[in-house]
Amino acid sequence: MPTFIEMDRTVTLADQLKDEGQSVVLINTFVVPPAEAEALLAAWTADAEIMKRQPGFVSTQLHRGIAGSGTFLNYAVWDSVAAFRAAFTNPEFQARLADYPASATASPHLFRTVAVPGICAA
């Protein structure tokens, strides 16, 4: 099971899960020793198979750091915080966390897009 480390020390994932707003992006960074990267990838793949079946799931993309890095970044889009909360607390998903390498750390955090005039739309 990964050790969870808050990405933002002032706003925890538990705080974010209380939000009732719509459309969110989950950013989750995982870190393992490079030698355990394949084990992390296998565990994440099994989790992603569960998550993509959940109501409100839109899409996901996994990224890996370059040059042999053991750092991964998952970017997942959900219709709402409620949909993500239901998926994250799903017993089937929670049971799969034990499949991650013991050395793994995970830092999940929820985001919303920000409009910056002339640069990007929300």
How would you label these PLM feature ranges?
Residues 29, 48, 109-113:
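General detector of folded, globular domains
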Residues 1-24, 61-71, 96-122:
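Glycine-rich beta-strand-turn "strand-cap" elements at beta-sheet edges
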Residues 13-15, 20-43:
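N-terminal first-folded block
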Residues 78-95, 114-122:
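A broadly tuned preference for mixed-charge, low-complexity surface segments
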Residues 36-59, 92-96:
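Short amphipathic alpha-helical segments
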Residues 23-31, 61-90:
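Short, well-ordered beta-strand segments in beta-rich or mixed alpha/beta enzyme
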